[in-house]
Amino acid sequence: MLANSLKSFFSSTRKTTQLKNMIQSKDLSFIMEAHNGLSAAIVEETGFKGIWGSGLSISAAMGVRDSNEASYTQVLEVLEFMSDRTKIPILLDGDTGYGNYNNARRLVKKLEQRSIAGVCLEDKIFPKRNSLLDDGRQELAPINEFVAKIKACKDTQQDADFQVVARVEAFIAGWGLEEALKRAEAYRNAGADAILMHSKLKEPSEIEAFMKEWKNRSPVIIVPTNYHTVPTDTFRKWGVNMVIWANHNMRACVSAMQETSRRIYEDESLVNVEPKVAKVKEVFRLQGEDELKQADKKYL
């Protein structure tokens, strides 16, 4: 009964409002990575209430690096399929906004046209480099430049509930807590709806230190890819609002495809893989084949 009520609520509430409510809530929420329409459908069906449109995962699915090698129009096309296939909100990993304030505000306009609920922008220079690269030299944008980008995005959005998340890369660049707090406060004052505080340490000391000093000035989102052994109750205790499971569907696909391809290549047979892969009927179901059958009965 409760599950049906929640399903009805989420299907009738605007995606932007759904995402805003999740971010603003005192309860810790979780969103899961997807990188195309199929993975988005699986995330929604699993029960997640939101989707992370991962720049790394979308780029990887295209076979290119996470360095803005996929153009924003190519990313928008992927997002359109993801949005059409689901009723839950998508928060896009918008990198640096694909340029300056003008590129970023145009991105917001195009995202709203596709019913994307929000965008997360990071305070690095364009083109970006992935934050988890071992030898990646990270260059941060000047604070005033990124502040202007946030303001331009907020001024551009037509839906008041569209979310602009400011991702602070001070820890990633090795600039420390003081700089992280300085940037987060500037972005909050510029109108950012939430702060995504990123860290690539294997333990969460940087995030813990930030949360203690931040004192719930505005919602905080984290991405515990590297400090994944920390219990989520710890994040609740610190006052984190949202956790992003950022790239695991894409990585699961990579592992599964590598193993399946290797096995078929070595065996010259499907005998050992057929029991382990999804049935074709399951793929048809996820594609919505039943709806087409019903439509055929009605219109043909």
UniProtKB/Swiss-Prot annotation:
GO biological process, one term: organic phosphonate biosynthetic process
Pathway of action: Phosphorus metabolism; phosphonate biosynthesis
MF (Gene Ontology): phosphoenolpyruvate mutase activity
Catalysis: reaction(s): phosphoenolpyruvate + H(+) = 3-phosphonopyruvate
Keyword Isomerase: yes
Gene3D superfamilies: Phosphoenolpyruvate-binding domains
Highest rank taxon of the organism: Eukaryota
Prodomain residues: 1-10
The protein's Enzyme Commission number: 5.4.2.9
Active site per UniProt: 66 (nucleophile)
Keyword entries, A-Z: Isomerase
Family named by the database record: Belongs to the isocitrate lyase/PEP mutase superfamily. PEP mutase family.
Function summary: Formation of a carbon-phosphorus bond by converting phosphoenolpyruvate (PEP) to phosphonopyruvate (P-Pyr).
Protein name: Phosphoenolpyruvate phosphomutase
Species annotation: Tetrahymena pyriformis
Gene name linked to the record: PEPM
